[in-house]
UniProtKB/Swiss-Prot annotation:
Chain residues that bind ATP: 124-131
Disulfide bonds: none
Gene3D superfamilies documented for this protein: 1.10.8.60, 3.30.720.210, P-loop containing nucleotide triphosphate hydrolases (3.40.50.300), Peptidase M41 (1.20.58.760)
Species whose genome carries this gene: Thermoanaerobacter sp. (strain X514)
Key words of the record: ATP-binding, Cell membrane, Hydrolase, Membrane, Metal-binding, Metalloprotease, Nucleotide-binding, Protease, Transmembrane, Transmembrane helix, Zinc
Protein family membership: In the central section; belongs to the AAA ATPase family.
Name assigned to this protein: ATP-dependent zinc metalloprotease FtsH 1
Length: 611
């Protein structure tokens, strides 16, 4: 970048010098003597009054001297008429006349404007080329140079000690480390180490971190590049960059080449429709050739990461290229505790902080979520002027990560406050009464994010499957807010829009994907289609009749109506509990899990006066 700035500064300096020379030439080419400029009519009057001593005609321009010694110049519109007028004066000797051929400026002065335009064009072309390359490279034509960043031992090393919650994944990758450290042990047994390792998993699970840890453990050079860095607006650039990347890797073997977000370049090749795909496909073809082209034990291992394995080209996934696929999943409770330990190393924690409790309260959190959680807690503690992070900040950070920051400044009318209170109380009371829902962790009518209020349920353990009864209870819980509005306020609001949408989606999946409908049986309705324009972007197409479609709609409607009636029955039987929770929310605005349990069981809590 500094080299680019130097080049641009030099070009600007030369341009300024060029402009200065051009201006000096223009000034030099003009006469510096003061000459009076008169119009054509005044010139005729002077000649007629015999006040002109001499004139010189150069083209249409007239220069002359008056009898009082004043020099002048003028422009003649019609030379023929002018000569007809002055001829008598010349013949009578009253006027000295001289005619000179018109002489233009030197040829090199005439070329200066054209040269100026050429220089301007070259500068703009250079800037355009630099931008087309994304600013990379110090040479105009360095399109084909790889943008991979090489990390060596001099940089801060990441090891497996910095990775937690992925024990099985580390075991799989340990073989790669062993091969890079002690290749002879494998070669003597005729083993072929995988050429490529594909790390698959949701965003934030630590795929990039694992790749860095492999390089750090093996102590070999690590080339890091994003899939999007290959593709440019010019066809052929991506393929050239792939070649250059592997040329660099061969020079530094044994090494690791890490391609992050490989789906940007490795997307399924289409049928040639839609346009705009040639550059990406050429890049992918070159990548396929390079991965299957270098010799078997050259010591180059390609690690790639993606969260969209479904759209990758099959040729990329076959044995011999990415022949080892490692799924990096969401950590379990033990993994979350280990991750929290890593991210709390440099943070002073208060004695009341229990990372085990935090791990239990964060099911579904990825490693990135947990890092963000610890950072949010540290920011909250700093904002409150604390020297240590307490459990209160961590609890608040969990809620911030899940639902967003509180919006206490938003002013709500009493009517809206009552509506939100009964809506959230309906969710909480129904969740408490259902056998298959997690315990209530927090209920609030303080807006967070895009929600006017929320009821947070926190599972006590990780769940990987859901039964039919659990899904039905989830739908009942989602409809609890709408039912409470209808029962108490005799009106319904738009606040249940997201609840109804989620409930309908669950019911539709129960019928069309999970085969949980007794009437339709264990069948899947609708097939996943592979859109040729988008490169295997998943959609659903109907493979059933209109009659079956109507039956699906009836089944979804039946499930929703049954859940609605069940929620209505539960709230009618426990209407006093609903009123107590709503009153507590109106007065206190927020109830934690312990306070909710007390209110639900008829006990008093601080800050709320029950009649």
């Amino acid at each position: 970048m500094n080299d680019n700035n130097k080049i641009i500064r030099s070009m600007v300096l030369y341009l300024l010098i060029f402009i200065a020379i051009y201006a000096m030439v223009q000034l030099y080419s003009q006469s510096t003597e003061p000459i009076t400029d008169i119009d054509y009519g005044q010139l005729i009057k002077y000649i007629d009054a015999n006040q002109v001593k001499s004139i010189t005609l150069v083209g249409n321009d007239v220069k002359g001297v008056l009898k009082n010694g004043t020099e002048f110049k003028s422009r003649v519109p019609d030379v023929t008429n002018f000569m007809s007028f002055v001829n008598p004066y010349i013949l009578q000797g009253k006027l000295d006349f001289k005619s000179e051929p018109q002489v233009g400026p030197p040829w090199w002065v005439q070329m200066l404007p054209s040269l100026f335009l050429i220089v301007i064009f070259i500068i703009f072309w250079y800037i355009f080329m630099q931008q087309a390359q994304g600013g990379g490279g110090s040479k105009v034509m360095s399109f084909g140079k790889s943008r991979a960043r090489m990390i060596t031992d001099k940089d801060k090393r990441v090891t497996f000690n910095d990775v937690a919650g992925a024990d099985e994944e580390k075991e799989e990758l340990q073989e790669i480390v062993e091969f890079l450290k002690y290749p002879k042990k494998f070669l003597e047994l005729g083993a072929r180490i995988p050429k490529g390792v594909l790390l698959v998993g949701p965003p934030g699970t630590g795929k990039t971190l694992l790749a860095k840890a492999v390089a750090g453990e093996a102590g070999v050079p690590f080339f890091s590049i994003s899939g999007s860095d290959f593709v440019e607006m010019f066809v052929g650039v991506g393929a050239a960059r792939v070649r250059d990347l592997f040329d660099q890797a061969k020079k530094n073997a044994p090494c690791i080449v890490f391609i992050d977000e490989i789906d940007a370049v490795g997307r399924q090749r289409g049928a040639g429709l839609g346009g705009g795909h040639d550059e990406r496909e050429q890049t992918l073809n070159q990548l396929l050739v390079e991965m299957d082209g270098f010799s078997v034990n050259e010591g180059i291992i390609v690690i790639a990461a993606t969260n969209r394995p479904d759209i990758l080209d099959p040729a990329l996934l076959r044995p011999g290229r990415f022949d080892r696929h490692i799924t990096v999943g969401i950590p379990d409770i033990k993994g979350r505790e280990e991750i929290l330990k890593i991210h709390s190393r440099n943070k002073p924690l208060a004695p009341d902080v229990s990372l085990q409790v935090l791990a239990r309260r964060t099911p579904g959190f990825t490693g990135a979520d947990l890092e963000n959680l610890m950072n949010e807690a540290a920011l909250l503690a700093a904002r409150r002027g604390l020297k240590q992070i307490t459990m209160a900040e961590l609890e608040e950070a969990i809620t911030r990560v899940i639902a967003g920051p509180e919006k206490r400044s938003r002013i709500m009318s009493e009517k809206d406050k009552k509506l939100v209170a009964y809506h959230e109380a309906g969710h909480a009371v129904v969740a408490k009464l259902l056998p298959n829902t997690p315990p209530v962790h927090e209920v609030t009518i303080i807006p967070r994010g895009r929600a006017g209020g929320y009821t947070m349920l926190l599972p006590e353990e990780d769940k990987y499957y859901m039964s039919k009864s659990e899904m039905m209870d989830e739908i009942v819980h989602l409809l609890g807010g709408r039912v409470a509005e209808s029962l108490v306020l005799n009106d319904i609001s738009t606040g249940a829009q997201n609840d109804i949408e989620r409930a309908t989606n669950i019911a539709r999946k129960m019928v069309t994907e999970y085969g949980m409908s007794e009437r339709l049986g264990p069948m899947t309705f609708g097939t996943k289609s592979e859109e040729v324009f988008l490169g295997r972007d998943l959609g659903r197409t109907r493979n059933y009749s209109e009659e079956v479609a109507a039956e699906i709609d009836r089944e979804i409607k039946r499930i929703i109506e049954e859940a609605y009636k069940r929620a209505e029955s539960l709230l009618k039987e426990n209407i006093d509990k609903l009123h107590r929770v709503a009153k507590a929310l109106i007065e206190k605005e927020k109830l934690n899990g312990e306070e909710f349990e007390k209110v639900f069981n008829g006990e008093d809590i601080e800050g709320v006066q029950f009649a």
